[in-house]
Amino acid sequence: MAMELVHVGFGSVIAVNRVVAFLSVDQQPIKRLIRESKENGLFIDVTHGRKAKTAILFDTGHIMVAAVTAETIAHRLDTASMLSEGKIGP
């Protein structure tokens, strides 16, 4: 089984098969999860100093924050899926 990687900004990629959810960082419960993940050493910041827009929850318990929106990541995921299925050309 091939691992599908999706670009989440600034040279960072994620393994799609490990993602549980894409979440908005504006909600209080998500802010709490981010704070707890920082305390437990499970936090990954790939914003490069920009405003965090999306929190990505992984099956390992890690939380990554990215400066791109969840919609942008979803569009990249759809495009990658269509490329791998041969529906569109490279």
Task: Give short role names for the model-derived ranges.
Residues I56-P90:
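C-terminal structural segments of small proteins and small subunits
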Residues K31-N40, D45:
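Compact, glycine-rich, soluble single-domain proteins
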Residues V13, V25-I30, E39, G61-I63, ...:
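Short, charged/polar surface micro-motifs in flexible loops or helix N-caps
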Residues E4, A15, A52-T54:
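A generic structural signal for short beta-strands and their flanking turns/coil linkers
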Residues D45-D59:
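Short, structured protein-protein interaction patches enriched in aromatics and acidic/basic residues
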Residues V16-S24:
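Phosphoinositide-dependent membrane-docking surfaces
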Residues M1-V13:
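Short aromatic-glycine motifs in intrinsically disordered, low-complexity regions
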